[in-house]
Amino acid sequence: MAHFAELDSNNVVLRVIVIDNSEVDSNGGDQSTQAEEYVKDLVPLEGDGQVWKQTSFNNSFRRQFAGVGFTYDPSADLFISVKPYASWTKNLQGSASAGYVDWEPPVAWPGADVEYTDPWGNKAPYFWDWNEDNGRWQGNQIFEKDSDDLGVSKRVYWDPSSSTAKDI
């Protein structure tokens, strides 16, 4: 199945629809203007809709699958995800392994290899999330004694100057 994103006048995705591959193949093929025009004739634009742009469900073109609120960048020919936080800046060379692709935080992600030792002597990774109010990464220590007994969760923050997790 082929997927097409409806874009508004600011290239923001309004919705994504599915079209049979055979219809795309018969009308110019993948990523063609002809296929986009065919979809426009087949499925009328709504509201501020201006154009249809094909998107790839398996990310084989245009960087990533478009979602509602994403932006299409015509000069780079790719879809950009919604900005997650006001302090983050666009970085189209972002790393998916670092947890972000299109947007970069002002403080680098600590990484999955930052670990703590739980009360039973087991090593475990922190679960990091961004705190916009404090401009820092905060992590959880989740202690699990057994499958039925979750222990106390401890909050920490990442201190990039010392490269350590510190208690909140």
What is the predicted role of each segment?
Residues 1-168:
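Viral virion structural and adsorption modules
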